[in-house]
């Protein structure tokens, strides 16, 4: 039956045969796409995944090494329907026929990704992702609205972070389904309710991690438009850092996780104290600068007030009156001296003529003229004194000091004269100035 001589036999070792089989499989069949169900899934401590791919008639062992499986957003579990791209191979030490998986995605995820890219392109063309449509976060946030599941881990993470950073901030929850067929409509309705109530400063819209199908409600077009039309600023917080949704592109700010969203919208107590300290220092500096400016203005106004004070004006008027009186007196004295000299000259001439009657007549005339001149001089002096007295009386009449001396007072508010009761209000501090001092009082 076995006629071949030993010399003509091509004898393999087991390892060589397995190696040859592996080479043939890898070179002849190469890479394949496979639709199957996950079974016997094991995640090794090395980071590699080992599982079985099966359908209702057959199964094949599979391995997905760490470098490839780190690209998978959601770890598969028993019973998951998946689509894989793999290389057919043999594990030589045991001769196990297996697949080396390079890419794995939930079955149907490819279609979802194509829908995602198409909607993303359409909404971008309509301007929903433009930076000019995004609102800035408020400077001061005291109330935060959260649109998410009331029982999900995302809400717990958000509340934990807010309690740690700023326990005083108020949180209003808008319970919403965040997975399933009705989720997108509920998310839109919650955003609409939050805007109608207008009871928060900002909204966090999101949920925890999951598969592409789990997060799909945040890729719906109606959710994108609800976020776009929101008057309240919205921070998206969907899944993990690697999860990107349409809601992230439309939102005013994207946070990689719900916890990160809480960090972004809350101000820690240390930050608040630092900000308040900086504001206090700026206020103190500005107040000192303002007080210095007001002090300089007060000094300037005081100097100007002293220049135009009625007392100084009266002194100047009195000095001018004294100068005028001196000039009048000097003028009258000069005229009298000249008249006397004229009389003396005439008397001398008359005495030289010697007629006694003429001399007597001239003497009488001299006496009469002298008397008239004296009377005229006296009347002139009296009239000047009377005018001076009238001028002094008039100055005393118009002087505020004279008014104060008669029992009156002048009321000031903020260094300005109060001219009417309409200038005063309850609580105003006023100053009443009298002839001998001043008092301060408060208007009741």
Curated annotation (Swiss-Prot):
<dbReference type="GO" id="GO:0009318">
    <property type="term" value="C:exodeoxyribonuclease VII complex"/>
</dbReference>
<comment type="function">
    <text>Bidirectionally degrades single-stranded DNA into large acid-insoluble oligonucleotides, which are then degraded further into small acid-soluble oligonucleotides.</text>
</comment>
<dbReference type="GO" id="GO:0006308">
    <property type="term" value="P:DNA catabolic process"/>
</dbReference>
<comment type="subunit">
    <text>Heterooligomer composed of large and small subunits.</text>
</comment>
<dbReference type="InterPro" id="IPR025824">
    <property type="entry name" value="OB-fold_nuc-bd_dom"/>
</dbReference>
<dbReference type="GO" id="GO:0008855">
    <property type="term" value="F:exodeoxyribonuclease VII activity"/>
</dbReference>
<dbReference type="Pfam" id="PF02601">
    <property type="entry name" value="Exonuc_VII_L"/>
</dbReference>
<keyword id="KW-0963">Cytoplasm</keyword>
<keyword id="KW-0378">Hydrolase</keyword>
<dbReference type="InterPro" id="IPR020579">
    <property type="entry name" value="Exonuc_VII_lsu_C"/>
</dbReference>
<dbReference type="GO" id="GO:0005737">
    <property type="term" value="C:cytoplasm"/>
</dbReference>
<keyword id="KW-0269">Exonuclease</keyword>
<dbReference type="Pfam" id="PF13742">
    <property type="entry name" value="tRNA_anti_2"/>
</dbReference>
<dbReference type="InterPro" id="IPR003753">
    <property type="entry name" value="Exonuc_VII_L"/>
</dbReference>
<protein>
    <recommendedName>
        <fullName>Exodeoxyribonuclease 7 large subunit</fullName>
        <ecNumber>3.1.11.6</ecNumber>
    </recommendedName>
</protein>
<keyword id="KW-0540">Nuclease</keyword>
<comment type="similarity">
    <text>Belongs to the XseA family.</text>
</comment>
<dbReference type="GO" id="GO:0003676">
    <property type="term" value="F:nucleic acid binding"/>
</dbReference>
């Amino acid at each position: 039956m076995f006629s071949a001589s030993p010399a003509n036999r091509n004898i393999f070792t087991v390892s060589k045969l397995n190696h040859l089989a592996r080479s043939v499989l890898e070179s002849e069949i190469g890479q394949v796409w496979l639709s199957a169900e996950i079974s016997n899934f094991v995640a090794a401590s090395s980071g590699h995944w080992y599982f079985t791919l099966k359908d209702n008639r057959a199964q094949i062992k599979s391995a997905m090494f760490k470098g490839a499986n780190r690209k998978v957003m959601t770890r598969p579990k028993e019973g998951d329907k998946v689509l894989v791209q793999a290389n057919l191979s043999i594990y030589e030490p045991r001769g196990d026929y297996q697949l080396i998986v390079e890419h794995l995605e939930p079955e149907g995820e490819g279609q979802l990704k194509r829908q995602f890219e198409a909607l993303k392109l359409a909404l971008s063309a309509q301007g929903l992702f433009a930076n000019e449509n995004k609102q800035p976060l408020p400077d001061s946030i005291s109330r935060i609205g959260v649109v998410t599941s009331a029982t999900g881990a995302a809400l717990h993470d958000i509340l934990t972070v807010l309690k740690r950073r700023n326990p005083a901030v108020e949180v209003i929850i808008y319970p919403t389904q965040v997975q399933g067929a009705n989720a997108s409509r509920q998310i839109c309705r919650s955003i609409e309710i939050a805007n109608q109530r207008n009871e928060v400063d900002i909204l966090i819209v999101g949920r925890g991690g999951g598969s592409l199908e789990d997060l799909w409600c945040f890729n719906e077009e109606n959710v994108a438009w609800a976020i776009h039309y929101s008057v309240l600023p919205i921070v998206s917080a969907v899944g993990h850092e690697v999860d990107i949704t349409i809601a992230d592109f439309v939102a005013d700010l994207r946070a990689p996780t719900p916890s990160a969203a809480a960090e972004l919208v809350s101000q820690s107590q240390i930050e608040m104290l630092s900000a308040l300290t900086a504001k206090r220092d700026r206020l103190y500096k500005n107040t000192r600068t303002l007080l210095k400016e007001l002090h300089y203005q007060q000094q300037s106004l005081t100097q100007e007030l002293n220049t135009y004070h009625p007392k100084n004006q009266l002194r100047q008027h009195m000095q001018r009156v004294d100068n005028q009186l001196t000039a009048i007196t000097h003028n009258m004295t000069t005229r009298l001296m000249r008249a006397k000299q004229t009389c003396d000259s005439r008397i001398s001439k008359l005495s030289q003529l010697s007629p006694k009657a003429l001399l007597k007549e001239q003497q009488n005339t001299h006496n009469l003229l002298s008397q008239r001149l004296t009377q005229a001089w006296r009347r002139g002096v009296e009239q000047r004194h009377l005018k001076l007295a009238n001028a002094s009386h008039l100055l005393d009449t118009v002087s505020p000091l004279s008014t104060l001396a008669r029992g009156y007072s002048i009321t000031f508010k903020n260094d300005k004269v109060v001219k009417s009761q309409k200038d005063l209000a309850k609580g105003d501090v006023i100053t009443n100035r009298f002839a001998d001092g001043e008092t301060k009082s408060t208007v009741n």
